[in-house]
Amino acid sequence: MPTRDDLIKRRIAESEKAGKSTGVIVRGLQAVAYGLVTDWLTGNIDTEGGRIKYTAKNLGRVQGLFSVFQKFQKEYENTVLGSVLDWAGRLFGLNEQYFDTFDSPAESVADAARRLTLQRWGYNTLTGELIPGGYFQYLFSNANIGQRVAGLVNQAIAQKMPLAQFQKTFRQVFVGAPGQGMLERHWRTNSFDLYQRIDRTANLVYADRLGLEYAIYSGTLEDDSRPFCIERVNKVYGRDEIAHWADLQFAGKPKIGYDPFVDCGGFNCRHHLSWVSNEIAAHLRPDINKQKAEK
């Protein structure tokens, strides 16, 4: 029977594993997109002597690239969303196990945790669709990538670049080394702590429904951990103390929309809030009972 600490560690490890797994999927889809673009170039752009011709006809055809990206976008969205929902489901399961160790039954909270967590990040569990204007819709959108690719093709046409040279150069720019491709950079920049935030949100829904007042700032420290996290890791905090973080200024804090209960240490924070009962909180932090007595 895993202990509460074991389940905290599992949630943290699963969040890390989820991020790496989805990153691999994004890189694979990036290779698919590269193939689609190069196939389109071969079939649609006129060349002469192996060089791309600088003609109004070629420049006008570049618009067709957007249709290629629109079709790819649907495949990308469905595949990556499937991965996110799968890993989110595992995190929901671990959160349910975690709260099953409490005296209060968590069964009735499980569905609400899934629904409210995914809703917060832009997915409607009732319709199975992305919420317009939500975080997921922005995360899965690669319209700016399509514009950049079209710009590169326009430059190649203007320079009458050899098609083979462009394909090689484009591969270096679009795919690049692992983690450095266009789609990968967009994904990593905007989703670095996605699964950590999903876990924090689910844990908070349970805490709200079960009336829990204290949380452990869970996780480990890395070489690049910021002072905010170094000061708080593995310590217990009450809701009022956590809410007060919104009034602080610290490295990594988003300038707009910071929610201390979900964002913790801000951009790229890998720590979690693990909510505990008052009894456990008082055991881990004896001054809590003293504070209550003084109120």
Residue ranges and their predicted role:
Residues Q180-P286, K290:
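Acidic, glycine-rich two-metal-ion catalytic cores of nucleic acid-processing enzymes
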Residues M1-G179, V276-K295:
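N-terminal leader/targeting and assembly helices and adjacent pre-domain segments
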